[in-house]
Swiss-Prot record:
Pfam assignment, any one: Glycos_transf_4
Coiled coil segments of this chain: none
Annotated protein name in UniProt: Undecaprenyl-phosphate alpha-N-acetylglucosaminyl 1-phosphate transferase
This protein's encoding gene: wecA
Bilayer-spanning residue ranges: 40-60, 64-84, 124-144, 183-203, 209-229, 238-258, 291-311
Function: Catalyzes the transfer of the GlcNAc-1-phosphate moiety from UDP-GlcNAc onto the carrier lipid undecaprenyl phosphate (C55-P), yielding GlcNAc-pyrophosphoryl-undecaprenyl (GlcNAc-PP-C55).
Domain of life assignment: Bacteria
Length: 357
């Protein structure tokens, strides 16, 4: 087991070192613009690193993995499409179409789909029937794009995905599904080299890398894959509503932002600077402070989900809490300028009090 984790880490880490000059040579880099305020052209190779690390783990633990060929094929397609998008910018509708095809393959060949939503509406199981197939496709696209869209500041994608994988792993251990739990923690090991270099650890900003669409879509797909394995079928280790709490921050942020864009008559896929991390930085927080605060909030949400499972809290109550959280978040987004102005005022007041002291 330890050998697999070591090889996973080394595979991901060495891929970053190997791919840096190649990415710069072929133009697989992220250049600053009106939305992206980083310095210089940053290699978009985190996705390749994650894929290689994940592949190393799969090859060493092949017999323990579920549907390995289908999963590896799916993430390879996402990797290739993501790299093409990172280099040339392809249509978001084309990307969504490919994601839908992969979801259909997951349903047809892997028999992974949303059959029920648990008891989110009362003391009865909400069975979906054939409509569950459509909802599965939509949920797959949503999960992929939620993690893709939240990747806006250093460390955030690595932090949020690690929170999700740790939370899933804990619940899987509780249910004695050690193979899936082991993989969940191995995914964190595969992300770790990117996470460190994205934050400038240990080589500084000179070796900084970004995940890119290739990596963020791979993470989103992997999370929905594990969640489907964990929430559906008999004896599932977690309820579907718990999955909402585990990925609450990226999911709510995506839905709220897309709704706001549609309400303004814009494309839901049109980039802007209205995500939660942008608003926090506008309020005066640094990029590092925003990353830590959002990751902490995600950890709290995931903890609520875990505690709901451990203490058998009614699913409809957990769902009601999630809906309340969503509306509170949406309300804050629509009044972002007031909130950011109030936060800046409080920070200035606190600074004056500190200086007087």
């Amino acid at each position: 087991m330890l050998l697999s984790l070591i090889v996973t880490f080394l595979g991901a880490f060495l891929t970053l070192l190997f791919m840096r000059p190649i990415a710069q040579k072929i133009g697989l880099v992220d250049k600053p613009n009106f939305r992206k305020r980083h310095q210089g052209a940053i290699p978009l190779i985190g996705g390749v690193s994650l894929f290689v690390g994940n592949l190393c783990f799969y090859l060493l633990e092949w017999e323990q993995m579920r549907l390995p060929t289908l999963y590896l094929f799916s993430i390879f397609v996402l990797l290739v499409i993501g790299m093409i998008d990172d280099r040339f910018d392809i249509s978001p509708f084309l990307r969504a179409g490919i994601q839908a095809i992969l979801a259909i393959l997951m349903i047809d060949l892997g028999n992974l789909y949303l059959d029920h939503l648990g008891q989110i509406l009362g003391p009865f199981q909400l069975t979906l029937g054939s409509i569950g197939l459509i909802i599965t496709v939509l949920a797959t696209i949503a999960a992929i794009n939620a993690f893709n869209m939240i990747d806006g500041i250093d460390g955030l994608l690595g932090g949020l995905s690690s929170v999700a994988f740790v939370s899933i792993g804990i619940l899987l251990i509780k249910d004695n599904q050690l193979d899936l739990a082991y993989w969940s923690f191995a995914l964190i090991i595969a992300i770790l080299p990117y996470f460190m270099m994205n934050l400038g650890i240990p080589f500084g900003q000179k070796f900084k890398v970004f995940m890119g669409d290739a990596g963020s879509t791979l993470i989103g797909f992997t999370i929905i894959w594990i969640l489907l394995l964990s929430t559906q079928g008999k004896g599932h280790p977690m309820n579907p509503v718990t999955a909402l709490w585990i990925i609450a921050i990226p999911l709510i942020d995506m839905i709220a932002i897309m709704y706001r864009r549609l309400r303004k008559g814009k494309s839901p896929f049109r980039p802007d600077r209205l995500h939660v991390h942008h608003l926090m930085m506008r309020a005066g927080l640094t990029s590092r402070q925003a990353f830590l605060l959002i990751t902490f909030a995600a950890a709290i949400c995931a903890t609520i989900g875990i505690l709901g499972e451990i203490f058998y809290i009614n699913e409809w109550l957990m769902f009601a809490g999630f809906i309340l959280l969503f509306f509170m978040y949406s309300y804050s987004i629509t009044r972002a300028w007031r909130i950011t102005r109030w936060i800046r005022r409080m920070r200035r007041r606190a600074k004056r009090i500190h200086n007087k002291g």
